[in-house]
Amino acid sequence: MSIRSWPAAERPRERLLELGAGSLSDAELLAIFLRTGVAGKSAVDLARHLLNQFDGLRSLLDADLSTFTSQLGLGPAKFAQLQAVMEMARRHMAESLRRDSALENPTQVRNYLKAQLRHEQHEVFACLFLDNKHRVMTFEILFRGTINASYVHPRQVVKRAMAHNAASLILCHNHPSGITTPSRSDIDLTKRLKEALMLVDVHVLDHVIVGDGEPLSMVERGLM
């Protein structure tokens, strides 16, 4: 049955306009993005099918072009649309961060870092560079691959901090396993970087680990 034949109060778009996006299920939100279904399936039916195929919204959003377009109803145009929407969301978060102190809104900072790194399939190490008022200047990925004390070079981190004229920074890396518990190597790396950056008067405010669920703050865990 076409969504157009549904009662207005049950249609996803009308529900969003009346109640807000937060009131909709994942399938309803995805149906609005899809706009149309396929033969024998409404947009909502198709959305439910896709969420089942991808085992949830996260895997669907993180899928590469080949995996995404292998599903009925999803083509390159939809993939491009989705990437554009997600990038606009990331930029909106970054713009909001630049207006406020990172210390005053740590939850927003962690959500931003999660949005930047959660889709990465391999380990990535990055820095969020801040000015002397703890406002975000820029986010930069510095290393890809195995993230440990022997692979991440303090000299390069110091060099990028100096290039941005940063007063402080927040270290960040992801755990593709989804488990955010810091390893001994994570703790040792944080100590090395903190000591190296202290020599050029750049303060390390936190080290955030991104995985499944909420990002982990090493400061809040008492590990820095």
From Swiss-Prot:
SUPFAM superfamilies: JAB1/MPN domain (SSF102712), RuvA domain 2-like (SSF47781). A motif (JAMM motif) lies at residues 173-186. One of its GO terms (biological process) is proteolysis. Residues 102-224 form the MPN domain. Keywords: Hydrolase, Metal-binding, Metalloprotease, Protease, Zinc. Zn(2+) binds at residues 173, 175, 186. InterPro entries: MPN, RadC_JAB, RuvA_2-like, UPF0758, UPF0758_CS, UPF0758_N. The keyword Zinc applies. GO terms for molecular function: metal ion binding; metallopeptidase activity. Belongs to the UPF0758 family. This is UPF0758 protein PSPPH_0210. It comes from Pseudomonas savastanoi pv. phaseolicola (strain 1448A / Race 6) (Pseudomonas syringae pv. phaseolicola (strain 1448A / Race 6)).
